[in-house]
Amino acid sequence: MTKNIHDQRILILDFGSQYTQLVARRVREIGVYCELWSWDVEEADIREFNPDGIILSGGPESVTEDNSPRAPQYVFDSGVPVLGVCYGMQTMAEQLGGKVSTSDEREFGYAAVKVSGESAIFKDLEATQDVWMSHGDKVVEIPAGFTKVGETDTCPYAAMANEEKKYYGVQFHPEVTHTKNGLQMLENFVLGVCGCERLWTSESIIEDAVARIKEQVGDDEVILGLSGGVDSSVVAMLVHRAIGDKLTCVFVDNGLLRLNEGQQVMDMFGDKFGLNIIKVDAEERFLKALEGKSDPEEKRKTIGHVFVDVFDEESKKLKNAKWLAQGTIYPDVIESAASKTGKAHVIKSHHNVGGLPDDMEMGLVEPLRELFKDEVRKIGLELGLPYEMLYRHPFPGPGLGVRVLGEIKKEYCDLLRRADAIFIEELHAADLYNKVSQAFTVFLPVRSVGVMGDGRKYDWVVSLRAVETIDFMTAHWAHLPYDFLGKVSNRIINEVNGISRVVYDISGKPPATIEWE
């Protein structure tokens, strides 16, 4: 490796926008490392990070309020390029001597920005740009040294620039896909203005991660809880590439997995990739612990506690394991820091954001803690994991434990597994699986009368659920074809003895959540 992939970096200061993580993902997509910190970060931390450029995010506050957040003064004293987005532009304008006012005309949705003059931020772009606006306040007077480089019919300063100091502000959101050339604008800033190179690629991330794992663990042995999910699977492949047979994976089959999932994990990681895997069949133990529990939160906690106990027991059998590998990813780190302090912080190493025992005397290996989920999937492909596994729909940590409503019984799980497998199989066959964001089946603990042949049956009900969403914060129910739903229903009722009725969930989020529990 000729250059360190972290040498060139962008700092993003978070003012609370729902899109802030998306800004970071776009910068990474461009091929440059970045980190996301709270707006009130200390000057010393910025100096230590030594960014090549700083982006000020959007946010829900109003710059016109006395106690609204401001960028640290050092941002404008540091000599590095700065891009303000939405609220970020407004606080930049106000802090540097311009004026912001609350507007009677709020701009939400698509807008056409008329580009004026020559600005690095709009390099190689046409004179009119389709963008996405989401603001009430607006800049009414730009600071000295700035020029107007974009306007809309209702926003006189939709973009401003101080080319000499390399300060730029845009009132719209270049990070969202609704802004047609938003990625190009961010590239113009990150690559053009800041002078960064595209060092952050899947290949270089893998090379860097493997080197760091080798340096961290040396000749020691490592243990990993392998679930078959995306994060733990990619960690397994990275650590195995770094240290080979010194990695031992523990796969706990809790009886709450999808149909044949346990065998699929063993076949792929054991037989195909040659990893050392200990499989623990703990179905009876989990179901016993869940007896009589119907509250969703109590079920989640019980499943988590039993997993920790089982994993702890297995890890103690591996006397030489000095390190624990975990699938912590960057959003986990951000959310963990925010939940403890109310704000996102600098990435600190060895912060256990999982629920494993505090007394587990092992060092932590977390090779994904700098990565977003989409980056994890990309390096998974590069490491040889199958697309179907990396891009399948989300599956909750407690598994079927929160898809069997109420008390969990083996009979219910077995029925649900088979019904869900039919639904997913038919989605693939109809080329609909990748057109919905998430699809699954829920077991309802209610019986319903049905007719089979000349006889009546009194059996269980399942609900099909399919949603379309961009960020899983909000979701629409998927309008699947009636013929398709009819086929799935017929197959489930005919092939799964014990189910007499199939319903389809047409609730959006909000008011409903995506999962039922």
UniProtKB/Swiss-Prot annotation:
One GO molecular-function entry: ATP binding
Keywords annotated in UniProt: ATP-binding, Glutamine amidotransferase, GMP biosynthesis, Ligase, Nucleotide-binding, Purine biosynthesis
Reactions it catalyzes: XMP + L-glutamine + ATP + H2O = GMP + L-glutamate + AMP + diphosphate + 2 H(+)
InterPro entries noted in UniProt: Class_I_gatase-like, GATASE, GMP_synth_C, GMP_synth_GATase, GMP_synthase, GMPS_ATP_PPase_dom, NAD/GMP_synthase, Rossmann-like_a/b/a_fold
Pathway: Purine metabolism; GMP biosynthesis; GMP from XMP (L-Gln route): step 1/1
Record-level GO cellular component terms: cytosol
Record: residues binding ATP: S227, G228, G229, V230, D231, S232, S233
Entry annotated with the keyword Protease: no
Catalytic machinery residues: C86 (nucleophile), H173, E175
One matching Pfam family: GMP_synt_C
Keyword ATP-binding: yes
Enzyme Commission (EC) number: 6.3.5.2
Role this protein plays: Catalyzes the synthesis of GMP from XMP.
Subunit structure: Homodimer.
Protein name: GMP synthase [glutamine-hydrolyzing]
Organism for this UniProt entry: Vibrio vulnificus (strain YJ016)
Phylogenetic classification of the source organism: Bacteria, Pseudomonadati, Pseudomonadota, Gammaproteobacteria, Vibrionales
